[in-house]
Amino acid sequence: MAIQTSNLGYPRIGLQREWKKTLEAFWSNKINEEQFLTTMKEIRLQHVKVQQEKGIELIPIGDFTYYDHVLDTAYMLGFIPSRFSEFTSYLDVYFAMARGSKDHVASEMTKWFNTNYHYIVPEYEEGLQISLKDNRPLRLYEEAKQELGVDGKPVILGPYTFLKLAKGYTQEQFATILKQLVAPYVQLLSELHAAGAQIIQVDEPIFASLTKEEVQQAKEIYEAIRKEVPNATLLLQTYFDSVEENYEEIITFPVSSIGLDFVHGKEGNLNAISKYGFPADKTLAVGCIDGRNIWRADLDEVLTLFTTLQKQVQTKDLIVQPSCSLLHTPIDKTEETHLSTELFDALAFANQKLEELVLIHSALTQGTESISNELETYRNVHHTIRSSAARNREDVKAARTALKEEDFSRPLPFEKRYELQQVALKLPLLPTTTIGSFPQTTEVRQTRKEWRNGIISNEQYEQFIEKETEKWIRYQEEIGLDVLVHGEFERTDMVEYFGERLAGFSFTKNGWVQSYGSRCVKPPVIYGDVAFINGMTIKETVYAQSLTEKVVKGMLTGPVTILNWSFVRNDIPRKEVSYQIALALRHEIELLESSGIRVIQVDEPALREGMPLKEKDWDAYITWAVQSFLLATSSVANETQIHTHMCYSNFEDIVDAIRALDADVISIETSRSHGEFIDTLKHTTYEKGIGLGVYDIHSPRVPSKDEMYEIVEQSLQVCDPKYFWINPDCGLKTRRTEEVIPALEHMVQAAKDARSLLKTNA
C-alpha cells in the first residue's frame, strides 16, 4: 500500500501579511499592476516552496488567490454580473465584483460554511454565457512546474458546491445550469490532464449536507464529466463534516480518490466505512489533522485512527492530509516565544501541521518506533496543558454549577419591556443609530502602536482616546443620530479587546488568518477557564455618555461570537466555554447598567456561522448558543434596552433563534445581500425591535439618500414601524471619515423622510 502526504490548501496571507499589504498598496495606487502581479507571484511560489521543503508530496496549486477562491471560480466560468460590463481588464472586473465601484454595488459576501472566512457569492443572470473564460489552475500548475520543478496538485472548487453557493436562479433552473457547467469543467480538467497533472483535487464541501436526490444529481454531473475526461485522476474532496448519510452513494462516484474529514466528521465517516467499506480501486484521503484549530494533534489518537481504517479499508493507497485547507490557521508559531512554555508547546500552526503530517507518514511507513521520541514529547505536552491551573479553576466551576433556570430569562416579556423603555429613552419613531465602531484612522492606529511600544504614556493615550470620542460624539449630534456610540477607538478587534481583559485567553503576535479580501484577523486563543477580572468598557462608555444628553449605548461582543472567532481549547465542549464567557459578560453588563448606561448592545455576528452543517445537529447548537446570550443579558432591569447585531449570514435558517434571543432590538445586514432578509420576513413575523441595515459599509461608495430610503420603504412593508430602527449594515471601523459622514447624513435624511410619510399616512 502506497501512502502519500498531501495538503488541501495553504494560508494565502504571507508570514508577515505580505499578501494583504500588496493588495492594499495596489488598491491605493501605491504600486502598479506589473509590480502587483510580480509580488503576488513571488508570494505564491514561496508558499509552494515551503510545502515542498516540509516534505509534502501532493502540494496544492490554485488555492492561492488575489481575493477569494470562489470569486476566482466565478470569474473563470464567466459568472460576471452585467453591471460590471464597463470594466475590461481582468483585475478591474475581478476587484469590482469583490469590492464594488463608485457606481456599482459589490457582489454579496457571506460565510464559507461554518467558518469565519467569507466568500464572494457568485451571481447568475439570465442569458449568462457559461464557459471557461480563463484556465487559471492550468497557468498556476505550469508556473510551479517551470519555476520550482513541482508537479503540484491543482485544486478547484467542484461544480455542485459552486452552483449551490451561487444566487440569482430559481430552483427550477438549477438542473439546467448545472448541466451547462459540464463543458467548462471538462475543458478545465482536460487541459490540466494534458499538461501532466497527476491528480486534481475537486472540492465539494457541500456534500456533507445534501439530500439523497441532490447526491444523485451530483453523481450524474460527475459521470458526464468522467465520460469526456476518462483518464484524469480526480480526488473528490469533502470537509467540515462527515458524508455519512450519503456515503454509500458517494463512494460510487467515478473518481479515483475520495477525501474525508476524520476530525470534524470522524464518528460519522467511521460509522459509514464500518457499514459499507471502501472501494478497493479508490484511494482514501484521510483528513486526520485539524485544519481549523491551532492545537498539536494527538498523535496516538491519529495513529489509532489509521489502525482502525487499515483493518476496514482494502484500498490500494492512502493519503495523509489535514481535515480541510490550512487557510483557517496562522502560518507559523515560531515567533510566538512570548507565550508560556505550556501554551507554546501545545500549539501547531500551518507549518507545524505539515510537519505533523510527515511524522504520521513516517509512523505508518516505518513503524511507530521511528517517531518514538516525538510521540513521548507529544504525550508530555498534552498532559501538561490538560493539568494546568488555568484549565482547572474552582471558582469558574462553582459559578457554572450554581446557575438556575431564572438566570436565562428577562423578568417581563418584550412588549411590556419595550413600553417601559420608550418612556425611559424618549426616542422618536424610526430611531437612527450606528452599529458601534467609527473609522480607525492612520492616526488612531499609529497612536495605539506608540502606546503599546511605550513611546507615549497611558495618560497621553487616554487623552487621545477621549479626544477622538468627543469628536465623534459631536459629529453624531450634528448628523442627528438618535442613539450614539463612543466609537471604539480603544479597540483593535471586537473579540481581541475582550479577550485581553478576561482570564483564560492568550494572544499571538503573528497569528493572523484571512477573514475576507485583505481583511485579516488575529483570533484570541482560549486556552483556560474564562473569568471576569475588571470592568472592560465602563470608562470609555461612561465618558462618552457624560458628553451628551442623547443616549449612548454600551458595546460588547457576545459570548457565541467570542467563542466562534477564537481558537478554542478542545478538551471540553464548546458549550461550556460559551457559558463561561457569558458569565463574565453578565458581570460587565451589570456594571454598565449600574453606571447609568440604558442601552447595551451585545453583538452576535457569528451566531449563524457556528451552526453545524447538518440540519439534524442544528437544534442542539442553537439551544446552547441562545442560552449563552440569555445568560449574558438577562440580569438587567426591564427599562434597560438590550440590542444585538448580526451580519452576513443565511438568516432564514435562524429566524426562530433570533426571536429566542429575546433582544429588545436586533440590527441585521440587509443591503449587501440585496434584501434577502426582507424576503424572509415576508413569510414570517418578527414582533420585536429590528433594524435592517440600509447601506453596505464594506464598499467605499457613499450611497444616496434615495437608495437608503428605498430599503427603509421595503422594510416597512414587513416590519412594524413602532419597532423599526434605521442603521448601517455593520460597524464603520474600516471606512474613511469622508465616506462615513455623508453616508450617515443621507441615512438620517432617509429616516426623516420616512417619518414624514408615516405621519402623512397616519
Swiss-Prot record:
SUPFAM superfamilies: UROD/MetE-like. HAMAP family: Meth_synth (MF_00172). GO terms for biological process: methionine biosynthetic process; methylation. InterPro entries: Cbl-indep_Met_Synth_N (IPR013215), Cobalamin-indep_Met_synthase (IPR006276), Met_Synth_C/arc (IPR002629), UROD/MetE-like_sf (IPR038071). It comes from Bacillus thuringiensis (strain Al Hakam). Pathway: Amino-acid biosynthesis; L-methionine biosynthesis via de novo pathway; L-methionine from L-homocysteine (MetE route): step 1/1. 5-methyltetrahydropteroyltri-L-glutamate binds at residues 17-20, 111, 519-520, 565, 609. L-methionine binds at residues 435-437, 488, 603. It catalyses: 5-methyltetrahydropteroyltri-L-glutamate + L-homocysteine = tetrahydropteroyltri-L-glutamate + L-methionine. CDD domains: CIMS_C_terminal_like, CIMS_N_terminal_like. Its EC number is 2.1.1.14. It comes from the Bacteria. Its cofactor is Zn(2+). Binds 1 zinc ion per subunit. Catalyzes the transfer of a methyl group from 5-methyltetrahydrofolate to homocysteine resulting in methionine formation. Belongs to the vitamin-B12 independent methionine synthase family. This is 5-methyltetrahydropteroyltriglutamate--homocysteine methyltransferase. GO terms for molecular function: 5-methyltetrahydropteroyltriglutamate-homocysteine S-methyltransferase activity; zinc ion binding. L-homocysteine binds at residues 435-437, 488, 603. Zn(2+) binds at residues 645, 647, 669, 730. The active site is at 698 (proton donor). It is an enzyme of class 2 (transferase). Keywords: Amino-acid biosynthesis, Metal-binding, Methionine biosynthesis, Methyltransferase, Repeat, Transferase, Zinc. PANTHER family: 5-METHYLTETRAHYDROPTEROYLTRIGLUTAMATE--HOMOCYSTEINE METHYLTRANSFERASE.
